[in-house]
From Swiss-Prot:
This is Zinc finger protein 44. Belongs to the krueppel C2H2-type zinc-finger protein family. Keywords: DNA-binding, Metal-binding, Nucleus, Repeat, Transcription, Transcription regulation, Zinc, Zinc-finger. It holds the Pfam family KRAB. Transmembrane segments: none annotated. SMART domains: KRAB, ZnF_C2H2. One of its GO terms (cellular component) is nucleus. A zinc finger (C2H2-type) spans 189-211, 217-239, 245-267, 273-295, 301-323, 329-351, 357-379, 385-407, 413-435, 441-463, 469-491, 497-518, 524-546, 552-574, 580-602, 608-630, 636-658.
């Protein structure tokens, strides 16, 4: 029933609504279609579908808007709403939240009361003589379809229409007990697949759609389809449009004021829906309902292929795509496709440059939530989420969890096949797929399996050597986007991680490694060989020498490697292949990094600058060695005589003096 979808402002829109209602033709008990459009309604409603909810067709005005309307406009409003009720009444529609007597006691407190008065007035200002019971009688006697019992139209008394923060409501004061209606008996329908009890047939049909995959509601702007009008409305919240209701903060426009209010919560952070069990709050009611199922354990949607169950249909759909490989969300600029709409939105920020996550302490902005949370670790503060070990406070729980991982090496998940210990259940599950090969995405080269298509794609690059992420400044390519972001800091000079001694670092691991130089502690001990490390980074790197399977073997010398890329690099020592050639002097190199380093001898580029004296260097290692002349740091110590050196080359030269003594 596309009577008047949304809130109309002003006389032309209301007249348009009235004209539309005159053009309606009744084709059955479940739907009313516009004349001349027998197939599809304005918002994608097919002819065999049930009617939409009352709030989808109601016309609303606030106090301020109502005061600006003239007498003729108010009369037109009255006529439109009366006709809306007639149509809904005709099909036996009922609404929740019918009893709102207590909300109409105080006229100043509740804006709905005055709507009763304006609805009951006649065109000349006197009380309207026609009652809704008379409307009901005429509808029941003349227009009630055969399949709808008369009790489906039992509106007998005062009807109150008005504005609410989220919905419009109807109150029905009948004064008599209705006869039981078999078509609309309470909880008369039970869905076989999810066991949900439903009151009305149209509710049953709506619940049926997610199970059948039927999506009759389509967005006219992007063509995306939905199983219910509510899902279409949620889609419009994200999409926005050219509607009359504009957000004052970002300028995004919406067709309905309720969608604008929902959108505004993304700016204000308002979360009105709070879980009574864990106090977690949500900005949208549907998100709150989805969360509640975590506590109840309800998982009505089960995957037919692997029997995994999910609490909501959207999670079930996302999971199904891991089996089918479907990627329905495509980037309009570069054509890259994604299985989840959220991944597409994050990807689009690469093109738009949007960075919605801003650090309040230093002003730095990020396009990824994960990058933002990692950044927040460097700021010590009094945030509400405390580290259980050192008491450091963080603004986000994710940041606190990441930080806690730097203290503890607890790994409760043990693989029974290889004995490897893992700290997270998700990591353990992914690791087991490598043994069983049961994941939905299986590598044809090594047989490893993965549950995530993105992780699988990253793994494939270890075989193919593909490096799709290229630095725009120097042309260096990387296998992962995180490696590219880390590299880009070498050009920008950005070093957000600052030590108390004044030294700054571009990445978290380098910062944590440096922090250990202030302490002689070596808290990270290898359980296999007993070797201890002061840095968690070096400990992890060492652990891989024990745990990593070396499945890539050189056919010439038999040496094995844990990664295909390592094997390919090693093979060049046998073949003398040097695929990376300088365009200016034709000198060739094994590694692309060696080529880049060499090219700087032609360009004279020196991107690495000493912070103490401003001297520039072509290599980062040269810059680090030079900086030690300022700091006095000497990390290379001779075990024979105890003498320490600031550079590895000086240390190696010194070691030869001991070899001469031995010879």
């Amino acid at each position: 029933m596309a009577l008047c979808y949304g809130t109309f402002w002003g006389y032309p829109k209301m007249l348009e609504a009235a004209n539309l209602m005159e053009g309606l033709v009744d084709i059955g008990p479940w739907v009313t279609l516009p004349r001349g459009q027998p197939e599809v309604l304005e918002w994608g409603l097919p002819k065999d579908q049930d009617s939409v909810a009352f709030e989808d067709v109601a016309v609303n005005f606030t106090h301020e808007e109502w005061a600006l309307l003239g007498p003729s406009q108010k009369n037109l409003y009255r006529d439109v709403m009366r006709e809306t009720i007639r149509n809904l009444n005709c099909i036996g529609m009922k609404w929740e939240n019918q009893n709102i007597d207590d909300q109409h006691q105080n006229l100043r407190r509740n804006p709905r009361c005055d709507v009763v008065e304006r609805f009951g007035k006649s065109k000349d200002g006197s009380q309207c003589g026609e009652t809704l019971s008379q409307i009901r009688n005429s509808i029941v006697n003349k227009n009630t379809p055969a399949r709808v019992d008369a009790c489906g139209s039992s509106v007998n008394g005062e009807v109150i229409m008005g504005h609410s923060s989220l919905n419009c409501y109807i109150r029905v004061d009948t004064g008599h007990k209705h006869r039981e209606c078999h078509e609309y008996a309470e909880k008369s329908y039970t869905h076989k697949q999810c066991g949900k009890g439903l009151s009305y047939r149209h509710s049953f049909q709506t619940c049926e759609r997610p199970h059948t995959g039927k999506k009759p509601y389509d967005c006219k702007e992007c063509g995306k389809t939905f199983s219910s009008p509510g899902n279409l409305r949620r889609h419009m919240v994200v999409k926005g449009g050219d509607g009359p209701y504009k957000c004052e903060l970002c300028g995004k426009a919406f067709f309905w004021p309720s969608l604008l209010r929902m959108h505004e919560r993304t700016h204000t952070g308002e979360k009105p829906y709070e879980c009574k069990q864990c106090s977690k709050a949500f900005p949208v009611y549907s998100s709150y309902l989805r969360h509640e199922k975590i506590h109840t354990g309800e998982k009505p949607y089960e995957c037919k292929q692997c029997s995994k169950a999910f609490p909501d249909y959207s999670s079930y759909l996302r999971h199904e795509r891991t089996h089918t490989g479907e990627k329905p969300y495509k980037c309009k600029q570069c054509g890259k496709a994604f299985s989840v709409s959220g991944s597409l939105r994050v990807h689009e920020r690469i093109h738009t440059g949007e960075k919605p996550y801003t650090c309040k302490q230093c002003g730095k902005a990020f396009c990824h939530l994960g990058s933002f949370q990692r950044h927040m670790i460097m700021h010590s503060g009094d945030g509400p989420h405390k580290c259980k070990i050192c008491g450091k406070g963080f603004d986000f729980p994710g940041s606190a969890r990441i930080h806690e991982g730097t203290h503890t090496l607890e790994k409760p998940y043990e693989c029974k096949q290889c004995g490897k210990l893992l700290s997270h259940r998700s990591s353990f599950r992914r690791h087991m797929m490598a043994h069983t090969g049961d994941g939905p995405h299986k590598c044809t080269v090594c047989g490893k399996a993965f549950d995530s298509p993105s992780v699988f794609q990253r793994h494939e690059r270890t075989h193919t050597g593909e490096k799709p992420y290229e630095c725009k400044q120097c042309g260096k390519a990387f296998r992962t986007s995180s490696s590219l972001r880390k590299h880009e800091t070498t050009h920008t000079g950005e070093q957000p991680y600052k030590c108390k001694c004044g030294k700054a670092f571009s990445d978290l691991f380098s910062f944590q490694s440096h922090e250990t130089t202030h302490s002689e502690e070596e808290p990270y001990e290898c359980k296999e060989c007993g070797k201890a490390f002061s840095s968690f980074k070096y400990f992890c790197r060492h652990e891989r020498t024990h745990s990593e399977e070396k499945s890539y073997e050189c056919q010439i010398c038999g040496k094995a490697f844990s990664r295909f890329s390592y094997l390919k690099t090693h093979e060049r020592t046998h073949t003398a292949e040097k695929p990376y050639e300088c365009k200016q002097c034709r000198k060739a190199f094994f590694w692309p990094s060696f080529l880049l380093r060499h090219e700087r001898t032609h360009t004279g580029e020196r991107p690495y600058e000493c912070k103490h004296c401003g001297k520039a260097f072509s290599r980062s290692s040269f810059c680090r060695e030079h900086e030690r002349t300022h700091t006095g740091e000497k990390p290379y110590e001779c075990k024979e005589c105890g003498k320490a050196f600031s550079s590895l080359s000086s240390f190696n030269r010194h070691k030869r003096t001991h070899w001469k003594d031995i010879l």
